[in-house]
Regions:
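Catalytic cores of enzyme domains
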Residues: 1-13, 17-145
Length: 145
């Protein structure tokens, strides 16, 4: 999926392939931890042609995840985030200018970069995945011990 570059971030964002790691490296990163908190937020989106609204919803979802994770880390639950999209802490990503990542401890990759099939994950967690009644869910995870 990532190599299709539908989001435009392949090779230009540290959090995205090929820079974030191989599929096996990403899988091992998750499997090295014992727990995962799966989080879903729901957004009213009239239709998928509203790309600005979709981007804003993903951004707000990821921002909410980062706020939650800050609290979890403060309580001693060290881990990492998997977002609804690739990292957007710096716009553009420092990779575009050949600079080092400014936030390596906060950078997050998307579910696709981890080869996570979100529909199956949602079903396994008994969570709604489907877009219906103009409500679109976004998913994220916090992986920790």
């Amino acid at each position: 999926y990532c190599e299709e570059n539908l989001c435009g971030q392949y090779g230009v964002n540290y959090s995205c392939p090929p820079d974030c790691g191989t599929p096996d490296q990403m899988k091992q990163k998750v499997l090295a931890h014992k727990k995962a908190l799966v989080v879903s937020t729901e957004w009213e989106i009239e239709d998928f042609s509203q790309t600005d609204k979709l981007k804003e919803a993903k951004s707000l979802h990821n921002a909410a995840m980062l706020r939650m994770i800050k609290k979890l880390k403060a309580d001693g639950h060290d881990g990492f985030m998997i977002g609804a999209s690739g990292c957007s802490l710096c716009k553009p990503c420092k990779l575009a200018n050949g600079e080092s990542c400014e936030h390596p401890d906060m950078m997050y990759s998307c579910m696709a970069a981890y080869c996570i099939w979100v529909k199956k994950l949602a079903e396994d967690c008994n969570m709604n995945y489907d877009y219906k009644d103009k409500i679109l869910p976004f998913f994220g995870m916090y992986v920790f011990d």
